[in-house]
């Protein structure tokens, strides 16, 4: 973060990687080259790592060696969750943080003129993710050894890091401050007093003792004990039991919201909001749009009244330009502004992620412009937005794009491509062959039977939903245990299907897009690509290389493309696979390595998910029949399950259990 703050930032913390592995294959040269280039000041480079070569481990080694705060961006929440789990295992002693959109459900504010329908913003904020977002921003302001794993939501407006840091309340034993002054300070930074329901972002008061629950935690809180108008001592406590966990020499409490502004700035912001409203009202009236003029006046005056009274209003982010003191068109503050100037960015699956970063701005502006044109929002709401790609680029000090198939954009940014082709397991890229489409069903059935007899699994990728369904029906008739995975299947269900495939509940998985995250199955020895010669997103060079990679985790990996001609994309994908395979075979021969299928533990699919969903449903039925004591027991049990789900990053289930807890509490 740029600018001075009152926080003692620990600059000398070192990253410490914990792993039972040593770099092997071509990981050592990849790590060495990336590190040397970063230390030599190179701005951008690409880590072009084949599937299964241990790219995350290489990234971790680089982070440890360059020792800079690092932002890792993934293209969706699920992938970000997987990376967060891996980095947390590699760096147990450092701050590994998770920053994704905190909406479980999010319907953005919108207006549809054709049907005169205004859709109000409707969202449910996931409390666990909100905690993790606060944990990320506070860690960045307090220490140097921080890795933040984020989705593309990190380029959305977040509020000024300077206001956030300057609003922080700093407390030490011996400090002269009255209890009432502390209570006022806490309310100013959006903490709520609640002496009964003690949770994140709240505080309670008992005589000369104030207990405070920071927004970035969900288990331990802090107890501040006063002697007169002086802090006597500060202790960390267990929030549920109140048990003392030890004394604290310094406590920094960051605001309970990222959108902070001081009183002086608030007055200035309100003045500017009202001026902008008058201009907009006059413009609407001049155009004869009296409904729009009345609408924008009514809405703005209500919001301003809330800001004056509470310091906050729903949709406060739409006034962020005024709150931050930005000029029209200036980019908003984002998570990137919370980092120090010299930080490292790593873009995972960059061929997907960079496309997302490019597309965010236009989609956001189109929706908001409609709200402005019809008097639901002031024009300044257009400046509460994601960064444009060039604005994102201006934040880049040093960046590493990570992908098996880097996109054109990344290749234009740098000529430095560091390859990682050798797998630690000695596994080779699979053999690829092309077969004609005539008689492909019978041919495929024969191949499937040959694989399933050996206890191996098969992926089949089609181009259309109809073909996938027809093929599934045909294979079922032929006695094959098969499932079709379509795009409507939710993330959790997808994980369950993959687990069942690995366990042998069924043998063949058919899908249109088998490049989705988490679909890495070592038991798959055959990937069949139907209509391989139909050019398009999933049949271009990158799509084919990624699909071929799905067979690269098995020592008998084989790929069959069914096609009547060999397209340029097919040829390039086959040439690249053959090139890698040759390098891998030469390495194995030189080092006497025999390829070994990856031994990947089949984790008990978020073990609490199925049983708990059943239990939760059962509890729901019995709520009304419970007495008070039974309900208290049920609440404790559910809260434990909720924390377990959250720790496993199963936020959907955690939110579901949280709703059950709230329902139970409301019965008392």
From Swiss-Prot:
Q: Where in the cell is it found?
A: Cytoplasm
Q: Which residues form the Helicase ATP-binding domain?
A: 36-276
Q: Which UniProt keywords apply?
A: ATP-binding, Cytoplasm, DNA damage, DNA excision, DNA repair, Excision nuclease, Helicase, Hydrolase, Nucleotide-binding, SOS response
The entry marks the following residues as binding ATP, namely 49-56
Q: Chief subcellular site?
A: cytoplasm
Residues forming the Helicase C-terminal domain are: 440-606
List the SUPFAM superfamilies. C-terminal UvrC-binding domain of UvrB, P-loop containing nucleoside triphosphate hydrolases
Motif position, Beta-hairpin: 102-125
**Bridged cysteine pairs (disulfide):** none
Domain (UVR): give its ranges: 632-667
Its UniProt domain note says: The beta-hairpin motif is involved in DNA binding.
The family annotation for this protein states: Belongs to the UvrB family.
The protein's name: UvrABC system protein B
Q: Which gene encodes it?
A: uvrB
